[in-house]
UniProtKB/Swiss-Prot annotation:
Annotated tissue distribution: Component of the organic matrix of calcified shell layers like nacre and prisms.
Taxonomic source organism: Mytilus galloprovincialis
Signal peptide: 1-22
Record flagged with keyword Cell inner membrane: no
PROSITE patterns to which the protein is assigned, alphabetical: C_TYPE_LECTIN_1, C_TYPE_LECTIN_2
Stretches of the chain forming a coiled coil according to its record: none
Disulfide bond positions: 30-41, 58-156, 131-147
SMART domains per record: CLECT
Domain C-type lectin, chain residue ranges per copy: 37-156
GO cellular component, one term: extracellular region
Location(s) in or outside the cell: Secreted
Keywords: Disulfide bond, Lectin, Secreted, Signal
Name recorded for this polypeptide: Perlucin-like protein
Amino acid sequence: MGKLTVVGILTLFIFYIVAASGKCTAPVNCPAGWKKYKTNCYFFSPDGKNWHDAAKQCQTMGGYLVKITDSEENSWVVDMITKSVKHKYGYWMGMADLKNEGDWRWVNDSSAVSYSNWHRGQPNNANNEDCGHFWSAVNYEWNDIVCNTDQMGYIC
């Protein structure tokens, strides 16, 4: 086998590995009314709902309640919240401990919450609080609250 053939095969192999790893992705175009951050699109609701209805609305729009993976993303979301419609209690996020108390999971993929930004003393499960939200009273740090709290904003 000639050097040119070996180089060609190696080039194709490397291209395949890079493509398979997902590092070569097309640019993300978000629907009208959605905001782009890195490779994701986010929707900040102008209306309020309880957690279950908010989750259904996100699914209807082709998404899910927001999953926060790191402090940088959290900071960006909080910045966007401060520029959005204000809701009395804050905004729903896509985590809950509905199945096992204290076992906070992201509802889109059931993964455990690893990064968090809980307000001091939270989550405390007062009154059976099983759903997570960005709490407006404490600069949008995280809090657990009763899932049927109405008029909470939501982020998909």
